Amino acid sequence: MQSTIKPVEYDRPVAAGTVCGVGQAWAKVPDAPSAEERAALKARIKALLAREKAVLVAHYYVDAELQELADETGGCVADSLEMARFGRDHDAQTLVVAGVRFMGETAKILSPGKRVLMPDLDATCSLDLGCPADEFSAFCDAHPDRTVVVYANTSAAVKARADWMVTSSIGLEIVADLHARGEKIIWAPDRHLGSYIQKKTGADMLLWQGSCLVHDEFKGIELDLLRAEYPDAKVLVHPESPENVVAQADVVGSTTQLIDAAVKLDATHFIVATDLGILHKMQLAAPGKTFIAAPTAGNSATCKSCAHCPWMAMNGLANLADVLERGHNEIFVDPAIGVRARLPIDRMLDFAAAHKKRVQASGDLQRDQQLFANVGAA
């Protein structure tokens, strides 16, 4: 049984300088600065981070120069699980989150006493938009016997309705544990990730029908053709991708797991099915290896892979400097919602820490890594 919701409609901004992402999603993207402007902005941002005693937390999908700034200033470039941990544990009282809104909300939930800023508060997520809190709450009310598990890519209000929050790096293990205890599950919002976990674990899951507009655009037929061009390439796939893409993967995993695979696998070429922003970190982690973007369009298209989130692209040097200078674009979460939303997040973090210790104690790294190895790998 699966839920159904109306497709998300995205409004095109009327201002100039916008960009079309994929799936007809539009976002106001900062103009690219010149080389001189870029150098000046970076210097200004570094000075402002020091002045404000702030730390920059960036996701793998934001532009390379923001990732570089985070690394150079003692911040963090990571997936959403590590971003959550880092922001919670860092001494800085001001967190600047370069990513999309749910990441800023999660940082605020875990650090309610800290100031959380974002370059652009309109940077959202199709998974978040596709799972309105009121509709999801009604769906949960209709199935009161089920444990509610939600993906990190959701609003604070949706997290507050959940029993567990998960990220792609730990979701499979958590669902497997719940299934072993005989629990039936409501999963939201990504249908592809939910279906993948359902097949790997055999869990009884009702799937909310959301999707990531970037990963949903990857094409199985075109990927098969690209693999024929690069027969020795390993295929790295994020599990938010459609089933016919996941089925061709050598490795299925979170952003961090895909980067690790690029480093550890004995291959020189990799086809990567996730947001193009990750290629910066892959190239740094595995110099000398070649990374090829998986196709999101057919042979007749002028752009074979447009796999970059338009909302991630809203994070730029200029608006990052501006938010540090002015102290605006602060994230606020209703305290009552924040308290409830923290419970499923803390459950995930505690589970992840305990799971890591179990794996390290057993020394069975191969078993752990194979949790995200695709059973139908080519």
From Swiss-Prot:
<keyword id="KW-0408">Iron</keyword>
<feature type="binding site">
    <location>
        <position position="80"/>
    </location>
    <ligand>
        <name>iminosuccinate</name>
    </ligand>
</feature>
<keyword id="KW-0004">4Fe-4S</keyword>
<keyword id="KW-0662">Pyridine nucleotide biosynthesis</keyword>
<keyword id="KW-0808">Transferase</keyword>
<keyword id="KW-0479">Metal-binding</keyword>
<comment type="function">
    <text>Catalyzes the condensation of iminoaspartate with dihydroxyacetone phosphate to form quinolinate.</text>
</comment>
<keyword id="KW-0411">Iron-sulfur</keyword>
<dbReference type="GO" id="GO:0005829">
    <property type="term" value="C:cytosol"/>
</dbReference>
<feature type="binding site">
    <location>
        <begin position="238"/>
        <end position="240"/>
    </location>
    <ligand>
        <name>iminosuccinate</name>
    </ligand>
</feature>
<keyword id="KW-0963">Cytoplasm</keyword>
<protein>
    <recommendedName>
        <fullName>Quinolinate synthase</fullName>
        <ecNumber>2.5.1.72</ecNumber>
    </recommendedName>
</protein>
<feature type="binding site">
    <location>
        <position position="212"/>
    </location>
    <ligand>
        <name>[4Fe-4S] cluster</name>
    </ligand>
</feature>
<dbReference type="InterPro" id="IPR003473">
    <property type="entry name" value="NadA"/>
</dbReference>
<dbReference type="InterPro" id="IPR023513">
    <property type="entry name" value="Quinolinate_synth_A_type1"/>
</dbReference>
<feature type="binding site">
    <location>
        <position position="125"/>
    </location>
    <ligand>
        <name>[4Fe-4S] cluster</name>
    </ligand>
</feature>
<comment type="pathway">
    <text>Cofactor biosynthesis; NAD(+) biosynthesis; quinolinate from iminoaspartate: step 1/1.</text>
</comment>
<dbReference type="Pfam" id="PF02445">
    <property type="entry name" value="NadA"/>
</dbReference>
<feature type="binding site">
    <location>
        <position position="255"/>
    </location>
    <ligand>
        <name>iminosuccinate</name>
    </ligand>
</feature>
<feature type="binding site">
    <location>
        <position position="168"/>
    </location>
    <ligand>
        <name>iminosuccinate</name>
    </ligand>
</feature>
<dbReference type="GO" id="GO:0046872">
    <property type="term" value="F:metal ion binding"/>
</dbReference>
<dbReference type="GO" id="GO:0034628">
    <property type="term" value="P:'de novo' NAD biosynthetic process from L-aspartate"/>
</dbReference>
<feature type="binding site">
    <location>
        <position position="309"/>
    </location>
    <ligand>
        <name>[4Fe-4S] cluster</name>
    </ligand>
</feature>
<dbReference type="GO" id="GO:0051539">
    <property type="term" value="F:4 iron, 4 sulfur cluster binding"/>
</dbReference>
<dbReference type="InterPro" id="IPR036094">
    <property type="entry name" value="NadA_sf"/>
</dbReference>
<feature type="binding site">
    <location>
        <position position="59"/>
    </location>
    <ligand>
        <name>iminosuccinate</name>
    </ligand>
</feature>
<comment type="similarity">
    <text>Belongs to the quinolinate synthase family. Type 1 subfamily.</text>
</comment>
<feature type="binding site">
    <location>
        <begin position="151"/>
        <end position="153"/>
    </location>
    <ligand>
        <name>iminosuccinate</name>
    </ligand>
</feature>
<dbReference type="GO" id="GO:0008987">
    <property type="term" value="F:quinolinate synthetase A activity"/>
</dbReference>
